[in-house]
């Protein structure tokens, strides 16, 4: 398209938009809401109603209520991050400030409905509200509430997540020492829940467990990284594989290679998504039975691969946002049948009291999109047997069916608690799967082994094909295969490098990622850091890594010991997108301040227990100064703070606030900030949204009134009063990159199966301009170190 054509198109677009918004609904300005100007989708689907009436998933007498609920908009739901020490402060702030402001508020003559806590979610940490975006824009109090939600979401203190999607992680019963696999993890709200559970004890910086979050879609993996990074955990790894063929991983156990089996697996598979009709209204016109018939095979393959990698005694949760028994009970029944007693459905009826649920069904039928029904496989004509498979039908033998206990499955119906539709099944693995009885394990000690020279071994279940269709590897082929992989991997492992696969034959799909290079024990880079910050001897320096093999190391990241083990032993198999949290960044002025590396805020809660020097305890008034002023002079701080920093060398410091129990009106949770002491000043290196979070918790008003048309470009009084300081040279770049990820987040719905964006009050209001550009931006957001060697800007 030429320049003139583009100009003409731009001139026409505003007029076309005005014409569209004035027509159709006949409401003109009244219709210019979130979906203003577009023809309203009729929420009717005769085939849908016929199908589910026949399947009898809805109790007698409740059909009208069920359909009425599906036609109502879905309430927006938020979840307060539970493991952070200030979760109670956020809850207190929500209830005592923002909710109280809404108590007697009226908009357009109608009383605003108060947000309600989810009765079944622990400790009142999840809430839902019917406030729409249109209403949020009509009142300053509501606008403040919206800004609070958006900012806290960006910090990771609040997650926007559909209510029913919170159920699977809760039913996993995660402990901090569990090894967890999230098979289809993007966009990452359930993954965030799992990370929270690992860090249940905030006094343990490195829990023994970890989360490996996988997704088949490369772009969605970067959205997953963005979600996970908000929680600042060293125990999360994001990988990019097809879940139905995700490879077996190896770990070093006392010098031997052993297959990694997971204690917990979340198997939230792709689905037709008819449980999301309340938010994804396109489903009304697009729904057919063909969707479930096409997905059934993939869902069964993913679930099968999951139970293969589950440890004996482990728990796997299978879930979909579909109501269809072909995607739900049929998959579970087929999996139980071929497991030959190795799996059983767990009885979770006593878990999550307050959650209204329906039991799984034992009888269902299969329908084609033309409305033709089949009750048994034998009734299916040969020309239809490519669309319909035997595993889609219920088990006919009554004894076998009864032993499966399919009624232990959970189906959530929308009209019971004003939610979306959902299905959950909890599986326990009692013994190895029948087709994995001869699964080989390598217990071969490597010659001349050191901690950094582990190599990768492989076995039958490395995921190249579905294990039920491929026989296990013959035992006499093992030594040869192991030797081949030793030869290819040992050189990089010796250097502590986990990078892209070196051989073309083993190369994985997708983009080339920067390597993960662990610092060797004798690396001269670490000694000045250890001395400057007086690090505890127990500090696990072997877990430090960088993302470049050459040139100056500009960022230092950290992972847990267990994830280090996984990384070093699987560089040939895994496509790792991201892992670790940033703990140190190189100073732009080099070593003139005693140490070349300053502390990074995202890793400070992990590092703090090991730091014994350069810690300054500050009062709450000092914290307010640090967070509201750009580079305040030392004279502005309390005399006690001035005294503490007077004789301290310039450079990076830790600023610690401890609550005073005798002052209950002050903030009652501890705060740890990264700071910088200059010759005459003291500043905080804290991202903007995190600053706003702490200020809100301290009762400082940080609301920014939106400028109306025609207003000057000057700052509002509130913006000037509480303007967060620009903390780093690279902060502008950080904000732009976060905006790019946020735009992608607006494109990809938080909890739907690869579906349109959810219209909730908490969603950040950005539209994506170009998803390919977003992918490029977010890729650089994660893998910047080796690509930006010539800049001193700080990037995440």
From Swiss-Prot:
It catalyses: cytidine(48) in tRNA + S-adenosyl-L-methionine = 5-methylcytidine(48) in tRNA + S-adenosyl-L-homocysteine + H(+); cytidine(49) in tRNA + S-adenosyl-L-methionine = 5-methylcytidine(49) in tRNA + S-adenosyl-L-homocysteine + H(+); cytidine(50) in tRNA + S-adenosyl-L-methionine = 5-methylcytidine(50) in tRNA + S-adenosyl-L-homocysteine + H(+); cytidine(34) in tRNA precursor + S-adenosyl-L-methionine = 5-methylcytidine(34) in tRNA precursor + S-adenosyl-L-homocysteine + H(+). Residues 774-783 have a biased composition (Polar residues). It is an enzyme of class 2 (transferase). It is found in: Nucleus, Nucleolus; Cytoplasm; Mitochondrion; Cytoplasm, Cytoskeleton, Spindle. One of its GO terms (cellular component) is nucleolus. Its EC number is 2.1.1.-, 2.1.1.203. It comes from the Eukaryota. GO terms for molecular function: mRNA (cytidine-5-)-methyltransferase activity; tRNA (cytidine-5-)-methyltransferase activity; tRNA binding. The active site is at 321 (nucleophile). RNA cytosine C(5)-methyltransferase that methylates cytosine to 5-methylcytosine (m5C) in various RNAs, such as tRNAs, mRNAs and some long non-coding RNAs (lncRNAs). Involved in various processes, such as epidermal stem cell differentiation, testis differentiation and maternal to zygotic transition during early development: acts by increasing protein synthesis; cytosine C(5)-methylation promoting tRNA stability and preventing mRNA decay. Belongs to the class I-like SAM-binding methyltransferase superfamily. RsmB/NOP family. TRM4 subfamily. This is RNA cytosine-C(5)-methyltransferase NSUN2. The gene is NSUN2.
